Amino acid sequence: GLAALGADIQEKGSRIVCRAKELRGAEVILDFPSVGATENIMMAAVLARGRTSIVGAAREPEIQDLQSFLNQMGAQVRGAGTDTVTVDGVASLSGGDFEIIPDRIVSGTVIVAVAATRGDVTIEGAQPGHLTSLIHVLRRAGIQIDVTNGIMRVSASARPKAVERVVTSPYPAFPTDLQAQVMTLLALADGVSLMKETVFEGRFKHVDELCRMGADIRVDLNNAYIRGVPCLYGSTVEATDLRAGAALVIAGLAAQGRTVVEQVHHIDRGYERIEEMFRRLGGDIVRESNERLIALDAR
């Protein structure tokens, strides 16, 4: 994408070095609707000479928010939210104030945690329209979610039901970034669920850690077969990546006994003091060190 605009890109060891004397508009066709690729090409194209068309662009709300931000600074971007984004380059940008949208994955993580611990929480400030696919899955699992004037009330008083099939896919379908968290919920469900990962390879690293806590999950290529168990048990587990770490925190709050989550730096990449967020909701969780969280049964 950036090379099509005229950038010289070289790999040097663990670094990627990009140089350009001038960027020129071009048609960029993405083989996959990558959020990061779409955003980087959009940002590069706003000051490029001429028009850039991104075909096969990602459609996530963050793309639409970036378009609003860039246009407020003087850019000329249109089409965000569709599969074609068009950018007409401008000579310069100006500063300004901009309020970003709520993080839908953080909101979704909270919703799943409430469901897994059988809580009752009202959530303000999120955007339910960005969470439609998650809400649909959780309602199938028997979780009560009421939305009124943008305010969500999530309540769960019984064991969740299995969901026959959940498939990750680019927005507006079910997000891969909530796959691990929802798998934790389904590990406690009554029945067998199937989670199919179609976005990233190797994104089931949390399965082994959940199984340490008593989950019954079998992985076959990009499919995870989840046979729900009545309860999980506290253990020492490792956050192998950002969303896996969040899932293990949820598991620790839902499990019987004491859970230690290690390698917390992965979680800190996407959640600001996750332990404080869950403590405000009644979770018994503390940060023992920069790399260890300790969670106790929140029920």
What are these regions, as identified by a protein language model?
Residues G1-R299:
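Structural preference for solvent-exposed beta-strand-turn elements
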